[in-house]
Curated annotation (Swiss-Prot):
Residues 29-270 form the ABC transporter domain. It comes from the Bacteria. Disulfide bonds: none annotated. GO terms for biological process: phosphate ion transmembrane transport. Keywords: ATP-binding, Cell inner membrane, Cell membrane, Membrane, Nucleotide-binding, Phosphate transport, Translocase, Transport. The keyword Ribonucleoprotein does not apply. The gene is pstB. Part of the ABC transporter complex PstSACB involved in phosphate import. Responsible for energy coupling to the transport system. Its EC number is 7.3.2.1. GO terms for cellular component: plasma membrane. GO terms for molecular function: ATP binding; ATP hydrolysis activity; ATPase-coupled phosphate ion transmembrane transporter activity. This is Phosphate import ATP-binding protein PstB. InterPro entries: AAA+_ATPase, ABC_transporter-like_ATP-bd, ABC_transporter-like_CS, P-loop_NTPase, PstB-like. Belongs to the ABC transporter superfamily. Phosphate importer (TC 3.A.1.7) family.
Length: 275
């Protein structure tokens, strides 16, 4: 892995992927000169970074610094709210996420999201998984059964619920509900998964399961996670971005960010001097 200092520019889309340690590293998402506004409030300021395919990128920083806002730009969740707008480019492979003509339903299938609190639908465990699949595909009952099982296995939940698929998703524990939401997300076969503080409402045991799952999921998906837990960021991520007041202050390999940051503000935040 290479060490990356704060990113001031992003390679052209046509640039060849880098080769590190014999492995090809490819940007799945390239953010270029991204600015975001809540009305007149300039919430994100000239953000430039790459999310490398099949790696976990953690976003850290104090509350209100723009971490969750940035995640919501990646799949255009901000479109649900009036008065919010983004400028610049967010390239998902060769497609600009900010293109006004983009099909948002298809975008959100490609870029899934898991929220801070578990959000299971008020329906059975089986239907929680099948619901999203039906929005995009018409498949047979046997194919759906297989898809549900694969998704629940991918969410590390199958062995716990395989005999109660007809039970309500709301009957599960908090940790199980969050893994159900992860399974629901991967059921539609996304390419990128966004985690917005996925463990903040969970106990330590459930948190450990989610972190282990994230490590497994990066084999198949590109992952971005927002967290206020410094230890969690250090444990689960390959790269870390520190944000402050809407700016990307420093971005690099997680080990370097936590052991030898180049910006004093990063060091002060990591060591608890503010935040």
């Amino acid at each position: 892995m290479t060490e990356i200092s704060i990113t001031t520019s992003v390679p052209d889309a046509g640039a060849p992927p880098s080769v590190v340690g014999g492995q090809v590293e490819r940007a799945k998402v390239s953010v270029r000169d991204l600015n975001f506004y809540y009305g007149d409030n300039h919430a994100l300021k000239a953000i430039n970074l790459n999310l490398i395919a099949n790696r976990v990128t953690a976003f850290i920083g104090p509350s209100g610094c723009g971490k969750s806002t940035l995640l919501r730009v990646f799949n255009r969740m901000y479109d649900l709210y009036p008065g919010q707008r983004a400028t610049g480019q967010v390239m998902l492979d060769s497609q600009n996420v900010l293109d006004a003509k983009l099909d948002l339903n298809l975008l959100r299938a490609r870029v899934g999201m898991v929220f801070q609190k578990p959000t299971p639908f008020p329906m059975t465990i089986y239907e929680n998984i099948a619901f999203g699949v039906r929005l995009y595909e018409k498949i047979s009952k046997s194919e759906m059964d297989n898809r549900v099982e694969r998704a629940l296995r991918g969410g590390a939940l199958w062995n716990e619920v395989k005999d109660q698929l007809g039970a309500s998703g709301l009957s599960l524990s908090g940790g199980q509900q969050q893994r159900l939401c992860i399974a629901r997300t991967i059921a539609v076969r996304p390419e990128v998964i966004l985690f917005d503080e996925p463990c903040s409402a969970l106990d330590p045991i459930s948190t450990a399961k989610i972190e282990e799952l994230i490590d497994e999921l990066k084999e198949d998906y590109t992952i971005a996670i927002v967290t206020h837990n410094m230890q969690q960021a250090a444990r689960v991520s390959d790269s870390t971005a520190f944000m402050y007041l809407g700016e990307l202050i420093e971005f690099g390999e997680t080990n370097k960010i936590f052991t030898s940051p180049t910006d004093r503000r990063t060091q002060d935040y990591i060591t608890g001097r503010f935040g």
